[in-house]
Structures are given as structure tokens and as C-alpha cells.
From Swiss-Prot:
Keywords: Chloroplast, Plastid, Ribonucleoprotein, Ribosomal protein
Protein name per Swiss-Prot or TrEMBL: Small ribosomal subunit protein uS15c
Localization (cell): Plastid, Chloroplast
GO cellular component, one term: chloroplast
Quaternary data: Part of the 30S ribosomal subunit.
Disulfide bonds: none
Classification via Pfam families: Ribosomal_S15
The UniProt record lists the keyword NAD: no
GO molecular function: structural constituent of ribosome
Family: Belongs to the universal ribosomal protein uS15 family.
Length: 93
């Protein structure tokens, strides 16, 4: 899978000291989102997991919006990873 290769690349690159970096957070949120999405395909009436999915989607959106406002250069570097993970572009004000 493509996403597992990204996890291994970023995990090796970042090690343990940079787990709070935006790239690592976006990647970990994306893996959680995909796992919950596949769970919800099997269990359509699991509303608590659906709520958790919406919360994680919001967290990922806020992290990306924060980065686009604070550091535009790093956000442009992250665009390649965002496009490869099939994340839709966030709407900024």
C-alpha cells in the first residue's frame, strides 16, 4: 500500500522527537480516518465511530489550515504528500 510506505518514510525521517510535526500529524490522522472509514462501511449504524471520524477530520483540517496561515513554504512542500494521500484541498478564508 502507498500509505504504509509514507508512514515508514516519515517515521524513519522524523524519529521519536518530531511526532508533533504537522507532516506526522496529517499522516497519522489520515491513517485513522481510513481505518474508521473501512470500519463504518461494515458497521453502518455505529454512530459513535462516525462522530469520532468527524472529529478527526476536523482536527486534520485545522492542522492544515494552521500550517497554510503560519508557514506557506512548508505548506507548499506538504502539498505533494497531500496529493499523494488523496486529501481534498481545504478551503481557506
Amino acid at each position: 500500500m502507498v500509505r504504509n510506505s509514507f508512514i515508514s518514510i516519515i517515521s524513519q525521517k522524523e524519529n521519536k522527537e518530531n511526532r508533533g510535526s504537522v507532516e506526522f500529524q496529517v499522516l497519522s490522522f489520515t491513517t485513522k480516518i481510513r481505518r474508521l472509514t473501512s470500519h463504518l462501511k461494515l458497521h453502518k449504524t455505529d454512530y459513535s465511530s462516525e462522530r469520532g471520524l468527524r472529529k478527526i477530520l476536523g482536527k486534520r483540517q485545522r492542522v492544515l489550515a494552521y500550517l497554510s496561515k503560519k508557514n506557506r513554504v512548508r505548506y507548499q512542500e506538504l502539498q505533494d504528500l497531500i496529493s499523494q494521500l488523496n486529501i481534498r484541498e481545504t478551503k481557506t478564508r
